[in-house]
């Protein structure tokens, strides 16, 4: 994305536009390093610290200062701080906008409010966007080499039509995904599932298919998971949904829901489901988010584990990566 923005015309803002856009375009993901602090730290800080309305502006200023100060050593070609800062804002803003468009979401209001913003339009790494950007950058470069071979004059500094076209196509693609997402949600809400009426529905992108969505819907007693085809030749079948039964009310479930970490996890999870099991000296309640398949090998697939004693008093609580629990259970 940074290279496309540079070649689409932002290189005219500064001679260092490309490196500035590249650095600012990836720097926000430094908060993903919280992964190495464990699942609990990852839940708290990823897509938050440097993706928020507080962290992102500070990050833009820090990066702009770094480039500006480095350029001051070259007295013959200094950089204007205002232009560098503008490029940093564009780079970080484009990055955060794409993250908001994913199903993972962003904690824009961190640290003031633990609320996730997500449009559920794109997978974390969308192969179709990557393909469009690559085509928009590589094909003009190939044509340029051919034109040089036949003696055409090289035009320097002009915006690349290929890069502009690629950015326009990406914008149209996201708009089309928004339309498809709305259709998927309406399709989910228009059906009954094994006799149950949906209360809330969500549609999440399938990275392998343009037309298939992971549908998840909440009914009074169950959470249903079903594939939703949109725009293709397949027909939606509500009866093919996989049913997950919610646990009934019990002292153990009620006590687990009141645990501080469980409440924080529920703010993160879109479709939380609790599983209750007896232990030697009490109870264990596991919360997972059905937005993700159970075997989804992504660090965003988190679970909360609440341990209670026989008197339903909180004994331990923690966040885990679902992939680690799956490995231990094998």
Explain the meaning of each model-derived region:
Residues 197-200, 207-330:
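Extracytosolic and intramembrane catalytic regions of membrane-associated proteins
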